[in-house]
């Protein structure tokens, strides 16, 4: 039974038992930055189990894409070395939310395994928590499993309820016993049953875990029964497939064998048992699905984990002899295997391929040099009888050549060595400290504040009359008084000043009363709900307890709001034009522009830019109102509000409806889309692999930009004696004229060079049977120099020639050597002899080479030395 059929039978079985088939959630958990990746089927149902996310069903079943690489759950270092560890795997699960409990969960599992999958009953063993008599009795008395194959597992992890068979969501909250089902591969395989000293062997393999959420644990450790008891089960598809296909390694199942064969094809390796092929086959699944879910290779967080996995796969390909990009070629094979079950993979095939290719090409630029350094260092350690690689060197490989630590550790492991990780960590810490010392960090960092939070009025007001000073800071320390001329941070109890957040810059403005004036240059958060006003006291003395009028720079705020609102419209438009894979990766919104970074792996075309501009400007013309609502996070997301992956939102969120856009946002915005005025994209470019950046302007800035552009068009039209509407046609005509003139000029140069070549041939000097010529060819370009050298070689038959030309203070050099002389005189060496004397360098083939220089004054002397240089070699 193939993996695809196993997956399908699982889902259909539970659908027949009243379960709703729920699509796999993203590998990037929504609204939970504490979890690096989705690593089990229950992640998407966490809030359902907690009772905060009601669903229209009480039974669900899923085939959940999962990743265990990075963060608390990390199997990456074991991938390729064991039979059952994967960076990516599929978790089959069925769930009950206050519906059925132990009886049905156990009976469903037994029926599926023994009736649908037809596993022999005598091959199945089960474990239960030692105190879970109910589950024990169901297995023994109702299902009929012999008691010798039912094993009670106690608290085997050093504390009460700390057991392999007792599950907890955390220190407090839902928890309960679980029962696990094992498959016995038979006495020919080493290992003992669960709970025995030999349980880590491969004979008894866990295939399914049924968790019974039965209790709620409070902070004191007290257990009370939940009013609604639930079930969460998980069974690894790969493990189940190995059992059903009668193999002992997950890498021997059909799905992996097809990917391993594909990896062998692109790496040109015939040994299908090679561990590197297993790594590559596993990693193409993890990398592809992470990219499908919006993760892009980067230097931090999830992006860095993806980069580590890609580079680990590349290193294994390099180990197999690949010196160029190969990994991305496996995406099509993965789509063939899993595209039907996961249509989102097929839809994103080209994007995934492009992102992986770009990341590969980037790493292949440095891997060879880095590997040579690493191999040399390991050889040196081995020669000294050592077993540990210097952590400083590992850090150099990380910092200079892009080698993640686990990649270096992987190579060491293959040689029976380890990395000095504490020394690596020390080197990393030193670099971070140096970066911190060199950088200019905001003064709010490290400020100690324990007072009340600031009440923000900036959504409705631009000024607040009775703002009380509750804290003052100078040079990072709390003070009671600030004097004129001092820079300080002021914390108020109430303020209209927006603190930098969500990409929007902080407000500027003034804090003042009759005797005092404090100019606010920036506004930043001291803590989550505490706002710091950074600036300079221009007049008077400011004390804690003083009352001030706080007034923002209204014009600057208005321009910033226009840009922020335009960013929302642009984000939506980009998704419409480029696709739903577009996700915000960063932004900066200030009074001058909006800068927006997003996931997309190709430059935008002119047409795509125009379409985005048109969509946004149509929304502006519609003059739709901006509607702000505060609601529960889950309600907002269900209502279509766009939330940014990786951001942590509170239970209550602020939702902005602006035209066709709906996003979670705490920033300030225009009242109507028409307030934006005009939207214009002025810059589009790449900032990293798979990340594009757009800069745009709005309002009066956009009007000025268009007017200035119009003026330049008129100037260009006048210079070409054309109307602005005829400019494109006129430029094309001029380009044709230039092309024609360049062709004529080239012909004249060739003719001149030919005639000069005849004259130059007469200047050649014979040295040991070889004609040597070094001369300047006035007015020649590189092409003409090359053609002339070829003609002279034909004419002189046996020759070593250097020709030079000077234009605009730069020297061009071409050297040519006939085949009979090139064994002793190399054109590359000859041209470099001259180039080094004129401030340049070059290279090429033994028979033809070129170079350049920047010191034409030295050229005559350099050419004069050619004859002697050739004589020495002949």
Swiss-Prot record:
GO terms for cellular component: cytosol. Its cofactor is Zn(2+). Its EC number is 6.1.1.7. Gene3D superfamilies: 2.40.30.130, 3.10.310.40, 3.30.54.20, 6.10.250.550, Bira Bifunctional Protein, Domain 2 (3.30.930.10), Threonyl-trna Synthetase, Chain A, domain 2 (3.30.980.10). Pfam families: DHHA1, tRNA-synt_2c, tRNA_SAD. Its main location: cytoplasm. SUPFAM superfamilies: Class II aaRS and biotin synthetases, Putative anticodon-binding domain of alanyl-tRNA synthetase (AlaRS), ThrRS/AlaRS common domain, Translation proteins. Coiled coil: none annotated. Keywords: Aminoacyl-tRNA synthetase, ATP-binding, Cytoplasm, Ligase, Metal-binding, Nucleotide-binding, Protein biosynthesis, RNA-binding, tRNA-binding, Zinc. Zn(2+) binds at residues 564, 568, 665, 669. It catalyses: tRNA(Ala) + L-alanine + ATP = L-alanyl-tRNA(Ala) + AMP + diphosphate. One of its GO terms (biological process) is alanyl-tRNA aminoacylation. InterPro entries: aa-tRNA-synth_II/BPL/LPL, Ala-tRNA-lgiase_IIc, Ala-tRNA-ligase_IIc_anticod-bd, Ala-tRNA-synth_IIc_core, Ala-tRNA-synth_IIc_N, Ala-tRNA_ligase, Ala_tRNA_ligase_euk/bac, DHHA1_dom. Binds 1 zinc ion per subunit. GO terms for molecular function: alanine-tRNA ligase activity; aminoacyl-tRNA deacylase activity; ATP binding; tRNA binding; zinc ion binding. Disulfide bonds: none annotated. It is found in: Cytoplasm. Catalyzes the attachment of alanine to tRNA(Ala) in a two-step reaction: alanine is first activated by ATP to form Ala-AMP and then transferred to the acceptor end of tRNA(Ala). Also edits incorrectly charged Ser-tRNA(Ala) and Gly-tRNA(Ala) via its editing domain. Consists of three domains; the N-terminal catalytic domain, the editing domain and the C-terminal C-Ala domain. The editing domain removes incorrectly charged amino acids, while the C-Ala domain, along with tRNA(Ala), serves as a bridge to cooperatively bring together the editing and aminoacylation centers thus stimulating deacylation of misacylated tRNAs. Belongs to the class-II aminoacyl-tRNA synthetase family. HAMAP family: Ala_tRNA_synth_B (MF_00036_B). NCBIfam families: alaS (TIGR00344). This is Alanine--tRNA ligase. The lineage of its organism: Bacteria, Pseudomonadati, Pseudomonadota, Betaproteobacteria, Burkholderiales.
